[in-house]
Regions:
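Bacterial Sec-dependent N-terminal signal peptides
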Residues: 1-15, 173, 177
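Start-of-domain marker
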Residues: 13-62, 70
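Residues that define the transmembrane beta-barrel architecture of outer-membrane proteins
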Residues: 13-15, 25-27, 59-65, 78, ...
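Membrane-embedded beta-strand positions of outer-membrane beta-barrel proteins
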Residues: 17-19, 33, 45, 67, ...
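Transmembrane beta-strands of outer-membrane beta-barrel pores
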Residues: 21-25, 47-53, 71-73, 86-92, ...
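Repeated loop/turn-to-beta-strand initiation elements of outer-membrane beta-barrel proteins
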Residues: 41-43, 77, 127-131
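Flexible, solvent-exposed loop segments that connect beta-strands
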Residues: 48-62, 90-112, 143-162
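Outer-membrane beta-barrel "beta-signal"
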Residues: 72, 163-178
Length: 178
């Protein structure tokens, strides 16, 4: 009971919803929710989905989830925070030159998962609205089938790739519910 009371405020939680406008700008709708349990700790989970095929030769289909635990330096939803987050991505990319060694001449169908640390800052705008800036760095493990593009019947092969670097970037509009 003592350990539980250390992390949870008996007076109630504060809840916020948000959207990351950087992902909105690349046509990936997203929504996040964050619950603060006391003055310094919160948990956040965001989901992202892009089901678009841009043309017969370009596709950026994917969905992603990102849960995160955050420690707020001053107080919840105000100022600096540090976080630890996990990430899972399921994707089907085609005809695009992407990071991680993926070439435009191929298409890729697979998933990635990993863990990361993050830093961010929430800027107070009004009692209900904030703007959040965040970046995360860490590790992602990719597993995918690689196809000749346009996609042939059989994959060229199954591949794995390890990535260390930027894993999260965000400028989010935050609405505080309670």
């Amino acid at each position: 009971v003592f350990l539980l009371s250390t992390f949870m405020d008996i007076q109630g939680q504060v809840v916020a919803v948000k959207t990351n406008v950087l992902y909105d700008a690349i046509t990936t709708p997203n929504v996040g929710a964050e619950v603060a349990f006391n003055k310094h700790w919160s948990v956040e989970a965001s989901g992202y989905y892009n089901g678009w095929t841009f043309s017969s030769d370009k596709s950026f289909k994917h969905w992603m989830i990102q849960p995160e635990a955050r420690y707020w330096i001053h107080e919840r939803f105000n100022g600096h925070f540090f976080g630890v987050h996990a990430q899972y991505i399921d994707y089907d990319f085609a005809g695009l030159k992407l990071l991680y060694g993926m070439e435009k001449k191929n298409s890729y169908n697979g998933n990635a998962y990993g863990g990361c640390i993050s830093y961010g800052y929430q800027l107070y705008v009004s009692p209900r609205w904030n703007v959040e800036f965040t970046a995360g760095f860490g590790y992602l493990h990719f597993e995918y089938d690689k196809y000749a593009f346009p996609r042939g019947d059989a994959p060229i092969g199954k591949f794995r790739n390890e990535y260390w670097g930027l894993t999260k970037a965000g400028i989010s509009i935050v609405y505080i519910i309670k």
